[in-house]
C-alpha cells in the first residue's frame, strides 16, 4: 500500500506550503518521469516538471495554481519574469527533480490546446497535418522542457488553425513569462526567487 511520507519532504521556497510525498517516491533510488506533450489551461505548458505533482500527496490546486502563469486564486494573471514559480522548487527537490534519472515526453500524438481533450494533428514541418510521431528523452530536465516549449510555441502560434475538437486556446504557449520557470531553473543567479 502506498502511503504519504511521515514528514513534509517538499518545501516551497516562497514559504507558502510544505507537503508530504508518497513513500515509494521517498524511497526510490531513482525516478523515470514520463509526460505528454501538451498545453495546460493554468500552467500554459505541461511537461515533466508539472508531472511530478502526482508524487505530492495534496491536491494540485493548493500547491501550484497560485504560481501558475494564467490562474491564481484571486483571478489575477501572473505573467512576466522573475516571479515565484513552484515548478522550480519541484525541479530542484532532492526527492523529485534531482532524483529523476530520465525524463521522457510522449509526443506520438501531441496534445491540443486544452489538456482535458484529445490530441490533434500538427501543421509544422515535418508533420504537415499529421500526428507528431515524436519522443523526447533527456537526463536534463531544463533541456527537455525547453525543447518541448519551443515545439509547442512553434505549433501553437496563433496562426495555425487546429481541429475544433481541441483548439480552444490556440495561442497558449506564447504568453509573457511562460518559460520563466525554465530561466530560473537554469540560472543560479535567480535562485533567490525559487530556492529548492
Model-derived regions, located:
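Extended, low-polarity segments enriched in aliphatic/aromatic residues
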Residues: 1-194
Amino acid at each position: 500500500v502506498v502511503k504519504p511520507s511521515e514528514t513534509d519532504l517538499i518545501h516551497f521556497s516562497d514559504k507558502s506550503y510544505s507537503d508530504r510525498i508518497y513513500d515509494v517516491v521517498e524511497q526510490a533510488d531513482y525516478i523515470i518521469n514520463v509526460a505528454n506533450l501538451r498545453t495546460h489551461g493554468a500552467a500554459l505548458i505541461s511537461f515533466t516538471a508539472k508531472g511530478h505533482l502526482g508524487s505530492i500527496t495534496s491536491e494540485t490546486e493548493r500547491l501550484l495554481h497560485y504560481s501558475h502563469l494564467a490562474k491564481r486564486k484571486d483571478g489575477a494573471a501572473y505573467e512576466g519574469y522573475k516571479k515565484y514559480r513552484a515548478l522550480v522548487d519541484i525541479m530542484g527537490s532532492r526527492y523529485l527533480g534531482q532524483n529523476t534519472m530520465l525524463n521522457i515526453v510522449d509526443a506520438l500524438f501531441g496534445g491540443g490546446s486544452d489538456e482535458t481533450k484529445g490530441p490533434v494533428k500538427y501543421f509544422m514541418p515535418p508533420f504537415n497535418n499529421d500526428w507528431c510521431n515524436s519522443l523526447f528523452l533527456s537526463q536534463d530536465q531544463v533541456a527537455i522542457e525547453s525543447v518541448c516549449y519551443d515545439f509547442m510555441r512553434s505549433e501553437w502560434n496563433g496562426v495555425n488553425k487546429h481541429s475544433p475538437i481541441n483548439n480552444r486556446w490556440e495561442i497558449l504557449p506564447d504568453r509573457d513569462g511562460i518559460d520563466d520557470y525554465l530561466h530560473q531553473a537554469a540560472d543560479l543567479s535567480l535562485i533567490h526567487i525559487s530556492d529548492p
